[in-house]
């Protein structure tokens, strides 16, 4: 939600929060009513898979609610790319994900959309190789993707991210999903044996388990597990409103 707050403060746009249900899914009824009431260009921003509770939203159903040409869906797929097969129509959608979540280098990422929609985006930064011509009066941008990639790119990072995606393709998403499911079930089974632990949201978690220990500090627990070579993350998980709820 942070980027949307920045954009809202910069351009004076309105942010409307659509509530989620108990299982973590978007309230589709409220979303549909909100879209019907919206005037002018609208953007729906969702996470495909929640990075706090692991629930996956149904992208096909949400996409079907878009009935106007000036409404776009932006999908944060950082938690699902490389783990879940994706089949999307990008007529009114963009999909974004980060490189480090697909086992690639940090500082890399990707945006996927139709050439038509990507061409409508304005450059965020200025630099070389993004322009067709420069004059005193104006600038003519180069075609996509060049107009969105100014200056010297993170060449090593991009190559590393590409190799990471090839590695995922070689192993196969079905194999990865099956392995994650097995690890998740084992983790849940062991955690459920400890009375002091409360687990958030049972069900299909796509390799993600959130829990807390009653009367224990989460950072202390994470530090202890880290000393035992068990890597976990503590705190708000970049989703403070959901964790607090």
Name each model-derived stretch.
Residues 1-245:
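Pyridoxal 5′-phosphate
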């Amino acid at each position: 939600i942070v980027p949307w707050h920045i954009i809202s403060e910069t351009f004076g746009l309105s942010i409307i929060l659509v509530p989620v249900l108990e299982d973590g899914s978007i309230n589709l009824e409220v979303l549909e009513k909100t879209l019907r009431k919206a005037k002018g260009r609208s953007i729906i921003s969702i996470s495909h898979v929640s990075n706090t509770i692991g629930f996956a939203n149904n992208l096909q159903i949400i996409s079907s609610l878009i009935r106007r040409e000036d409404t776009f869906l932006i999908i944060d797929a950082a938690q699902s790319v490389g783990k879940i097969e994706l089949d999307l129509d990008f007529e009114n959608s963009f999909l974004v994900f980060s490189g480090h979540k697909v086992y690639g280098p940090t500082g890399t990422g990707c945006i996927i959309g139709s050439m038509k929609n990507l061409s409508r985006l304005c450059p965020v930064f200025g630099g070389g190789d993004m322009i067709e011509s420069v004059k005193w009066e104006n600038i003519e941008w180069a075609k996509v993707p060049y107009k969105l990639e100014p200056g010297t790119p993170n060449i090593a990072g991009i190559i590393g991210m590409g190799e990471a995606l090839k590695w995922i393709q070689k192993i196969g998403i079905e194999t990865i999903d099956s392995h994650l499911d097995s690890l998740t079930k084992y983790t849940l089974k062991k955690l459920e044996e400890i009375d002091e632990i409360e687990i958030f949201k049972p069900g299909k978690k796509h390799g993600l388990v959130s829990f807390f220990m009653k009367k224990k500090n989460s950072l202390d627990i994470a530090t202890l597990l880290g000393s035992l070579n068990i890597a976990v993350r503590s705190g708000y998980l970049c989703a403070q409103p959901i964790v607090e709820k």
